[in-house]
Structure formats: C-alpha cells, structure tokens
C-alpha cells in the first residue's frame, strides 16, 4: 500500500482549503501562494509559503501595517522589492543572502548540488516537519523553485515521490500539495533549502 506523509503543520479547513497550524495554535487562512499573489517569481513565492508554514509571519499581516516595518513579512517584501520583479528569477545566492540577513533565527540553510543526497535530506527535513525549498531544472534553460511538504512511500517501502507546493499552479480544495516530483525520473535537482 502506498503511503503519503506530509508535514504536521498542514491542515484542511472545513471548506477543504489548505491552511497551516501556527506555533500559537492559530490556523492561517493561506498556505499556497500562486504567482501573481506577491511581486516576484517562484523563489519569492516559495519563501513566502515556507515562512507562512513555519509561523514566521501571519497571513493577516500581509495587508496590514499595524506592526510597522518590523513585521517579518514586510522585511521580506522590502528585501524582494530591492530586486524589483526578478526578470531572470531569484538566484540561489540572493535567496541565501535574504534569508541569512533577515530570517536566520527561523530558517536553516543547507545547500547541496548532488542529486543522490537530495531525496534523503528532504525526507529527514519532512520527518522533522520542516518544509524544504528546492530549485529544480525543468529543461536546459529553465528552473523552478518549489516547496517540498511531504513524500510518498511505495509498496516496497521506498520513497518514490516528493509532494510539493508549486506557485505556477492553483491548489485544489482538499489537497495538501499540487506537484509531485517523481524521484525515479528526476534528472537535475540543483539545490535544496530548509
């Protein structure tokens, strides 16, 4: 029997929408950010999803200035705005710099470029309820940032898929993920962050 394992913070509300449980116990109304929800591209959306899941900022603070410029989300938005709309995407070095300068108390960065070690490292993070930002190569000229939130175990008790949130696609009601990364077919995973 195939099993699907997802991080503990994820929940479906009474309407079937994906929400996350904050450390304070408050459920957030939104986990998945789709391109167009923020000013940026997939890397920025992946960061926003991870920070939201980890409770770095609350969903309701996005459009509120009650906390002034100290709100964690506004720090991210200011940092993203320094780079405009990322016409060439958010580079790993820019993401690392943004995270280490502003969010180092919330997020650990672990950079790896070896395909062989990535699935096991991601599984370790998921088992600790830590979502993982990953950059994958879609083809020779295109990469995409995604957030791994779970994995699938096949009948042989082997990890076969990573379950992801992808900002390119809508998240359907009743779903915990909107992307599946087939580990047998991955050819060029490049980076992993958690």
Residue positions per predicted region:
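Generic short alpha-helical segment signal, independent of protein family or function
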Residues: 55, 100, 104, 193-194
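Short, well-structured alpha-helical interface segments that form or flank functional binding sites
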Residues: 37, 41, 45, 90, ...
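Noncatalytic regulatory segments and standalone regulatory/sensor domains
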Residues: 151-194
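Papain-like cysteine protease catalytic cores
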Residues: 67-130
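Active-site-adjacent substructure of cysteine-protease-like catalytic cores
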Residues: 110-165
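Active-site-adjacent structural segments surrounding the nucleophilic cysteine of cysteine proteases
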Residues: 1-85
């Amino acid at each position: 029997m195939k099993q699907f394992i997802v991080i503990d913070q994820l929940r479906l509300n009474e309407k079937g929408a994906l929400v996350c449980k904050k450390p304070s116990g408050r459920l957030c109304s939104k986990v998945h950010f789709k391109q167009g929800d923020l000013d940026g591209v997939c890397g920025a959306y992946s960061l926003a999803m991870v920070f939201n899941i980890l409770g770095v900022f609350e969903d309701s603070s996005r459009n509120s200035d009650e906390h002034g410029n100290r709100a964690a989300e506004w720090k991210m938005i200011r940092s993203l705005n320094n780079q405009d709309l990322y016409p060439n995407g958010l580079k790993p070095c820019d993401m690392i710099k943004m995270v280490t300068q502003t969010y180092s108390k919330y997020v650990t960065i672990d950079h790896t470029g070896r395909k062989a070690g990535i699935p096991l490292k991601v599984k370790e993070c998921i088992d600790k309820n830590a979502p993982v930002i990953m950059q994958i190569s879609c083809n020779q000229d295109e990469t995409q940032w995604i957030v791994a939130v779970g994995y699938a175990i096949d009948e042989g008790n082997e990890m076969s898929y990573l379950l992801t949130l992808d900002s390119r696609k809508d998240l359907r009601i009743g779903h915990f993920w909107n992307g599946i990364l087939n580990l047998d077919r991955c050819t060029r995973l490049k980076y992993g962050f958690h």
